Design a protein with these regions (language model features):
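Claisen-condensing/thiolase-fold acyl-transfer catalytic domains that form or cleave C-C bonds
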Residues: 1-111
């Protein structure tokens, strides 16, 4: 349980024609600490760009709307960094869902 973001992210990256190296900011669901660390390790995500404002343990884990919280946090941080971010500027929002499922969305900042 909790590793669903790994294949979901890999699939989203393939569909977008990107690699994990193209991602400059990531918000990963932190259902529990070791789960987020396992996902980061498997995907090769740096702690410098992942959950930069804290994960669900710090910010809260709103059951039923975790995806909305993760995407909103990602977009707010992308907007904050946009003036100095290299282009193209890509962010990743990913979360685990019950019984091993996962979701991933790649956001491209256009400005």
């Amino acid at each position: 349980m909790g590793l669903g973001p790994i294949p979901a992210t890999e699939k989203a990256l393939r569909r977008a024609g990107l690699t994990i190296a193209d991602i400059q900011l990531a918000e990963i669901n932190e259902a529990f600490a070791v789960q987020a660390l396992a996902v980061m390790q498997a995907l090769g995500l740096s702690s410098d760009i992942t959950n930069v404002n804290g994960g669900a343990i710090a910010l809260g884990h709103p059951l039923g709307c975790s995806g909305a919280r993760i995407l909103t946090t990602l977009i707010h941080e992308m907007r904050r960094r946009a003036p100095t971010a290299p282009r193209p500027f890509y962010g990743l929002a990913a979360l685990c869902v019950g019984v091993g499922q996962g979701e991933a969305t790649i956001v491209e900042w256009l400005n």
